[in-house]
């Protein structure tokens, strides 16, 4: 879908549908007032009849109003001005998009510039609006024999004042890149595990390298992984016929002297739990256990499209966790790339086993900050549900930057503690560390495990187990999170 920004009067635009705001108490917005005057009071007459009160969620379609070039005018309730937050604003925009799709017109124009969203300037409000529109058009029907009919709606014009046009256009550019990144992430996550395996993800990385010149891509096979001494990473994939892959993608958009930022993604393309087998119910959703790697792919795509002036290295630890005669057993001890030994008490705590070696590998790039992203623990879903990602780390400054980015992008995270006392739960009588810490504080002890491999750089861990996908029902599927948060963090660093 194409988004266009214009600073013209709404009554002069020839469009299939013109959308204007009506506040609670039948209060006409600026654009609605202009249209009402031109149409001889047609809008106020409809409102006086009580057809629309202006509450959030209400809408009314008017056909062929006199003296207007628009074929239709859609009145949309926006509630009380002082009470409109991010969530109701998104609901309003989603409702508009649903209505526009149903009308069948090829274009529409939104004259909603006067809407005030709490805590957001023109840029922030437009970002939210544009991301909602573009992401709302997402369809995944690759494996349907009956494809969805092509959408008639091809273009949406956003009206704004001349003074704000540059900021609104910047917001739209950022939003489109982020939405494209989210779409890429969702596509990868929604693919079935018989297609999306570690080798396939390596091929996706190489394809991205061909699409964007200047992106350096290296895919390390299982032989190289073993030679490097990544005993923990290798152990996770050794029970599968699908070999593991370590994917390294480097983008150098900044100065040569600038240290890179590093994103490390967990890429378990299917997680049975291994010998510590998961229950059968809902196991199909374990194809989403590569959501961390998928979100790194999506964030990188957004960065590449925006050509951000930063240096970025992306490291994806990809494997399939399967039971077999050659699979890792509970009680096995492995040696990590860092030299630390790990007693594997539960083979279903495999995400941290691939990430620890990837974090150690990231150290060679001398990064100024490392963020790992993983669908790591069910405990995070218990703690935070499906609305908020868990956030832990060893740098207060980095944590604050990510929290701020999440708030700005409406893709929130919440910090959990990483106190030394939790480290004791990982003690092992046979190795340097155990891979699980008992039933208490599962998200925290998982991050404590990772922290042992992140002592030499600023590090943060995003647990996206509750936010990477939606379970069950018609809305089941990958969400594309936390691409908005990560991209906003990098936009802030690039000051773009």
UniProtKB/Swiss-Prot annotation:
GO terms for biological process: proteolysis. Its EC number is 3.4.11.1, 3.4.11.10. Its main location: cytoplasm. GO terms for molecular function: manganese ion binding; metalloaminopeptidase activity. Keywords: Aminopeptidase, Cytoplasm, Hydrolase, Manganese, Metal-binding, Protease. InterPro entries: Leucine_aapep/pepB (IPR011356), Macro_dom-like (IPR043472), Peptidase_M17_C (IPR000819), Peptidase_M17_leu_NH2_pept (IPR023042), Peptidase_M17_N (IPR008283). Gene3D superfamilies: Leucine Aminopeptidase, subunit E, domain 1 (3.40.220.10), Zn peptidases (3.40.630.10). Pfam families: Peptidase_M17, Peptidase_M17_N. Mn(2+) 1 binds at residues 271, 348, 350. The active site is at residues 278, 352. It is found in: Cytoplasm. Its cofactor is Mn(2+). GO terms for cellular component: cytoplasm. It catalyses: Release of an N-terminal amino acid, Xaa-|-Yaa-, in which Xaa is preferably Leu, but may be other amino acids including Pro although not Arg or Lys, and Yaa may be Pro. Amino acid amides and methyl esters are also readily hydrolyzed, but rates on arylamides are exceedingly low; Release of an N-terminal amino acid, preferentially leucine, but not glutamic or aspartic acids. Mn(2+) 2 binds at residues 266, 271, 289, 350. Binds 2 manganese ions per subunit. HAMAP family: Cytosol_peptidase_M17 (MF_00181). Belongs to the peptidase M17 family. Presumably involved in the processing and regular turnover of intracellular proteins. Catalyzes the removal of unsubstituted N-terminal amino acids from various peptides. This is Probable cytosol aminopeptidase. It comes from Pseudomonas fluorescens (strain SBW25). The lineage of its organism: Bacteria, Pseudomonadati, Pseudomonadota, Gammaproteobacteria, Pseudomonadales.
């Amino acid at each position: 879908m194409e988004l266009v920004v214009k600073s013209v009067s709404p009554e002069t635009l020839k469009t299939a549908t013109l959308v204007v705001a009506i506040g609670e108490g039948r209060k006409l917005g600026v654009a609605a007032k202009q249209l009402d005057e031109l149409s001889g009071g047609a809008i106020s007459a409809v409102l006086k009849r009580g057809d629309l009160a202006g509450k959030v969620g209400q809408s009314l379609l008017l056909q062929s109003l006199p003296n207007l070039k628009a074929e239709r005018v859609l009145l949309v309730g926006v509630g009380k001005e002082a009470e409109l937050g991010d969530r109701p604003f998104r609901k309003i925009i989603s409702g508009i998009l649903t209505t526009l799709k149903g009308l069948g017109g090829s274009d529409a124009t939104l004259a909603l510039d006067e809407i005030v969203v709490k805590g957001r300037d023109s840029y922030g409000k437009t970002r939210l609006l544009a991301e909602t529109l573009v992401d709302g058009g997402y369809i995944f029907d690759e494996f349907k024999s009956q494809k969805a009919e092509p959408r008639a709606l091809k273009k949406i014009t956003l009206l704004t004042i001349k003074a704000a046009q540059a900021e609104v256009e910047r917001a739209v550019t950022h939003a489109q890149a982020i939405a494209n990144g989210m779409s890429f992430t969702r596509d990868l996550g929604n693919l079935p595990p018989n297609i999306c395996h570690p080798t396939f993800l390596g091929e996706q990385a190489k394809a991205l390298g061909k699409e964007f010149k200047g992106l350096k891509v290296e895919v390390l096979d299982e032989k190289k992984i073993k030679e490097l001494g990544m005993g923990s990473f290798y152990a996770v994939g050794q029970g599968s016929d699908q070999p593991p892959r370590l994917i390294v993608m480097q983008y150098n958009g900044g100065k040569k002297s600038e240290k890179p930022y590093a994103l490390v993604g967990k890429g378990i393309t299917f997680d049975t739990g291994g010998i510590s087998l998961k229950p059968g119910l809902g196991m199909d959703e374990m194809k989403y256990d590569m959501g961390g790697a998928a979100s790194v792919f999506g964030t990188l795509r957004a960065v590449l499209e925006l050509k951000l002036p930063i240096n970025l290295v992306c490291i994806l630890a990809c494997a399939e966790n399967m039971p077999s005669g050659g699979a890792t057993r509970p009680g096995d001890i492995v040696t990590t790339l860092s030299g630390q030994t790990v007693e594997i008490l539960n083979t279903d705590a495999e995400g941290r086993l691939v990430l620890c070696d990837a974090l150690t590998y990231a150290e060679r790039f001398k990064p100024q900050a490392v963020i790992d992203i993983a669908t790591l623990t069910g405990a995070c879903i218990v703690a935070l549900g499906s609305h908020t990602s868990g956030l832990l780390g060893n740098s207060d400054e980095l944590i604050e930057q990510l929290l701020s980015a999440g708030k700005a992008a409406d893709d929130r995270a919440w910090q959990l503690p990483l106190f030394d006392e939790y480290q004791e739960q990982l003690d092992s009588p046979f190795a340097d560390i155990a891979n699980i810490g008992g039933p208490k504080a599962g998200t925290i002890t998982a991050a404590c495990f990772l922290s042992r491999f992140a002592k030499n750089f600023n590090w943060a861990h995003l647990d996206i187990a509750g936010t990477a996908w939606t379970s069950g029902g018609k809305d089941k599927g990958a969400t594309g999170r936390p691409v908005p948060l990560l991209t906003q963090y990098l936009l802030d660093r690039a000051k773009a």
